[in-house]
Amino acid sequence: MRLSYLFIGFLFLTFMACRKSEGITTDSSAKLSFSMDTLLFDTVFTSSGSTNKRIKVYNSNLKAVNITDIKLSGGTSSYFSLIINGQSVNQKTNLQIDGKDSISIYVKVTIDGNNQTEPFIAQDSILFNTNGNKQSIALIAYGQNAVFINNQTISSNTTWTSSLPYIVYKSVTVAPQATLNILPGTKILFHGSSAMNIKGKLVANGTVANPILFSGDRTENFYAEEPGQWNGVHFYSSSSGSTLNYTIIKNAVIGITADSLSTTNKPKLSLTHSIVKNMTIAGFVGYNTQLDAFNNLFYNAGQYLLYGVAGGKYNLKQNTFAGYTKKLARKTPSVYFSDSDNGRPAANLNIQIANNIIWGSLAEEFLIEKKANTILETTIRNNAIKTLLKTYEGNFNLLNIDPGFIDPIKYNFMLQDSSPLKNKGFGYEQ
């Protein structure tokens, strides 16, 4: 008896399943609905192509509908391409959607280059014909010409201008004895795990109004502040005298790496009036290197904002190191120095720190460790520091006094009018 019930149940389910696709309505009022009426692509660099974006097409009718035709209005000359219900085609005929069901259409855009320096618009539409009903979805993309750099070495003095963004694939390397000058307003965008390798000299001189940008090449809003999109800028042992002034370095694994002392009487790197943010590991990593940093903002790194080990020379004035993260679970101090590092020889460490704010969400945000028989010289004066140590008391330092950022959770590190740090800085020059 039980088998009979099971058999009847099976027949019922089979009958109901068949009914879903049974009958195709030809009613002219049976229209499709869409997840959006306009699909917008943010800046798409010419020749590189976009990611796929999805549109859902719904049949809200009880009966199935037959879509006579789905196609791109621009046909074969369109910048856009489609994947319709799993097939890479730009036109499909007689596609059936069961009642109360849907299909997916994926859209990609690849824009040919031209001679324009300003962004331009590429447009098309997807056309649907169902029971005589003509419906459409608008497709809009903002195209941008660019200079593409693919695993390139710069062997002579070169200047990059702001007329077009530079898109780096794999790497760009400045050879020893060569200088790369970057003018105000220039954008250098890195694809995937690419990097900039400086074996000569980098001179990036932006301005307040037109800073220079180093970032990933993903232009969608989701990636605007997403760490880990490229590998960062690396200054090698043959490099010296580089400058980063009014620059924004963001969304990398390690923003800046410098692996040795300068070979001249100038610092390895002079970093001024810049922002270093959104790093998977660290904002700056130095191995027995020399850094002059003046009036910079560091924030949102997975481990360290500044990590200087194996000795070195550090002159830090009027910087803000704000150890706040949203997605990255940091357990290390924002600023860390040591004369040693695993696998590298220990070396003397000279640290000059004045007028800095070193603050964050942890109890210990500043740590100096001497582990070897080296010389440690420090001048730590007139800073606001969050620390468990009493080592830095005196010398006009303010310990564990909240600086009063306007909104650190939203990464606004301007000081409130009531901040205890207002008018407390000494008049240090760069």
What are these regions (language model features)?
Residues 57-61:
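Asparagine-centered strand-capping/turn motif at beta-strand->loop junctions
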Residues 50-51, 62-67:
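Short acidic/proline- and small/hydrophobic-mixed sequence motifs that coincide with surface turns
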Residues 19-25, 32-43, 48-54, 91-430:
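Beta-strand/loop edge motif enriched in small/polar residues
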Residues 73-91:
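Short, solvent-exposed loop/linker segments at beta-strand-coil boundaries, enriched for Pro/Gly
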Residues 14-17:
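C-terminal motif of bacterial Sec signal peptides marking the signal peptidase cleavage site
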Residues 1-5:
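Positively charged n-region of N-terminal signal peptides that target proteins for export
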Residues 8-12:
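Hydrophobic helical h-region of N-terminal Sec-dependent signal peptides
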